[in-house]
Amino acid sequence: GHSFEQAVANLFRNIGYTAEVSNRGGDGGIDIILEKAGRKIAVQCKRYKSSVGPHVIRDLWGTMHNLGYDEGCIVTTTGFTKGVIDFAKDKNIYLIDLNDILRSTSNGGEFYLRNRLGDR
């Protein structure tokens, strides 16, 4: 639901991003738009019962190009399949599992998040 997206957006705000939760219209499934220091990142939030599969990341990759995003990010609660992890390797797509954030105790997972997004 929408509260999930809001919670994720707040995590990014905590590390200095502006995060705009999009209202589901013609945005190619983008849930949150992040901006910081000239970077613009398209975020999709997935609350699945099982791991996020390759079709999700392929769709995001296409959407990023169509809408002119340099970077993308998928946030989930259930992890990612190997296919997704491989696909993301050489692309500017960051994979974030919320469970890892909850597990990483350092300042509420902020260090982990910054790391995942390649923040300097």
Short names for language-model regions:
Residues 1-120:
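Mixed-charge (Asp/Glu-Lys/Arg
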